[in-house]
Design a protein with these regions (language model features):
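C-terminal structural segment of proteins
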Residues: 1-268
Length: 268
């Protein structure tokens, strides 16, 4: 199938993009890489009257060192992160995660910002960046605001952005040199959507211990008492049950295994 006819716009600045979004309202879609939106357009799952391609905006490709964090422009590609072409604030976690996203052709075009706004529960970045404690900056006609990544996704394919807002950057805290991380996802074969995913951060210098379970039926689950879970991994099954992640025996098992294998990576 092919998409319905739409007007194609390629703004050169964030201000131009916001103006176009303001004019089009709910009839517009933003193209940041197209690896998810493209197939949805072709299958006519979305039918925008205007497509706004933001990949030509230089500010959205910038990388900035912000002291205790690295700020990624929304249009930084998965491949750029995988290849180490930009600074890594996570001690190898982000390149590792990027390398496991779909296929190289997808990683060449797909973007970190596009993935976050698409809000697919099975996507890698929403879970990973929630565990790291990252924030996104969104811009609209009323100014800028920051949203913690673990609060960005409201439900499946829905974010807390409002009409006319554009995600412009992602602020990723620098992990300390003695930080440990774990990440594990389960797919039936390479390139498929994850059926289970877990991310763990233990950063003593920042006093930060976070465990996030992704690839759920909705937004990632941030475990409230992560320190206890890591010190008592035998409680994994209970955590899965208490967070409503044991929909059936299969789901419960793959999520238990995913969580254990991520935790195992940070254990002494």
């Amino acid at each position: 199938m092919k998409p319905f006819a739409f007007d194609y716009e390629k703004p050169a600045t964030i201000a131009e993009a916001l103006a176009l979004l303001g004019e089009a309202g709910d009839d517009a879609k933003v193209l940041a890489g197209g690896q998810s939106l493209g197939p949805m357009l072709n299958m006519r799952l979305v039918r925008p009257r205007r497509l706004i391609d933001i990949t030509g905006i230089p500010d959205l490709h910038q990388i900035t060192d912000d002291g205790d964090a690295i700020v990624f422009g929304a249009c930084v590609t998965h491949a750029a992160i995988e290849d180490g072409r930009i600074p890594d604030p996570t001690g190898g976690m982000m390149p590792n995660v990027a390398a496991g996203i779909a296929y190289r052709a997808v990683r060449n075009r797909g973007t970190i910002g596009g993935s976050l706004v698409h809000a697919d529960p099975a996507a890698d970045w929403i879970t990973t960046l929630a565990a790291i404690g990252a924030e996104v900056t969104v811009t609209g006609i009323d100014g800028q605001r920051r949203i913690a990544v673990d609060k960005l996704m409201v439900s499946t394919f829905e974010t807390s952005l409002v009409a006319g807002e554009l995600l412009v950057s992602i602020r990723v805290p620098k992990l300390s040199s003695d930080a440990k991380w774990g990440f594990y996802k389960f797919c039936r074969k390479t390139g498929e959507f994850a059926e289970a995913m877990s991310a763990v951060i233990v950063d003593p210098a920042r006093g930060d211990i976070r465990v996030v379970i992704g690839a759920t039926d909705t937004r990632p689950v941030v475990i409230a008492d992560a320190a206890t879970l890591i010190s008592k991994p035998e409680s994994i099954a209970t955590v899965i049950e208490e967070n409503g992640l044991a929909n059936d025996a299969y789901d419960a098992q793959v999520r238990r295994v995913s969580l254990w294998r991520a935790i195992e990576q940070v254990m002494p």
